[in-house]
Amino acid sequence: MPDSTIPLLCVLGLLALSSACYIQNCPRGGKRSFPDLKRPCMSCGPGNRGLCFGPSICCGEGMGCYMGSPEAASCVEENYLTSPCEVGGRVCGSEEGHCAAPGVCCDAESCLLDSDCLDDSKRQPPSEQYSSLMEGLAGDLLQWMLHATRRERPQ
């Protein structure tokens, strides 16, 4: 093989390697894959009325948010799906959050109280705003606490 072809082969080899897809910026499926289409996030919670906001967060209108509870256990499956999901609702908070329930802003990691998410609930009469508080685990806990304070106290 002539000596002039070795440098040419080295240059072509380096060129081929430098146009590769680096780990940091590769799309799923490689550099020639199609972009991921967003799909709605999985349903969760009692009666599948909520949506998964993260691997252990399930929130829905009228039911509030469940974090790390059995109602949110099905949200772990989102991690194993290849295409990303998109949660509807208004954008809120500082970390790509979305309004999950009246007054609650959630992202994939956590939920926070956010007044930007109260607009929808302000239109409801006060009796309907607080009716969801008495449903589910929050209502059970509130009733237990009220019952515990009414018990006879030792003298």
From Swiss-Prot:
The UniProt PTM text for this protein says: Seven disulfide bonds are present in neurophysin.
Q: Which keywords has UniProt assigned to this entry?
A: Amidation, Cleavage on pair of basic residues, Disulfide bond, Hormone, Secreted, Signal
- GO function terms (MF aspect): neurohypophyseal hormone activity
User: In the UniProt record, does the keyword Disulfide bond occur?
Assistant: yes
Signal sequence coordinates: 1-20
Sites where Glycine amide occurs are at 29
Keyword Ion transport in annotation: no
Q: What is this protein's name?
A: Vasotocin-neurophysin VT 1
Species for this entry: Oncorhynchus masou
